[in-house]
Amino acid sequence: MLQDFPEKLRQRIQSLPDEPGVYQYFDSGGSILYVGKAKNLKKRVSSYFTKEHDTSRLRLLIKKIDEIKTIVVKSEADALLLENNLIKELQPRYKIGRAHV
């Protein structure tokens, strides 16, 4: 399924580190869509693009992703704190508070 996405996104996903951190998805207009945390950024972000999704809301999110930004942190706990702060600050369309897509 990863091959169905633009080369820019495939390259970005393949270059992600195997470290804890926070990832942010943006649409083509630069608006924030989603903020999430991961203990392994590469595995977590890749999972969105390599499996079938059971909700139409999640499928819609994935179709809108144009850019992926990440912030590497030292621990999963740091990722959780940063994720919560970024959600409050950026108010992404697909994740408010701890509620998932």
Would you name each region that the model predicts?
Residues 1-98:
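Acidic, glycine-enriched active-site microenvironments
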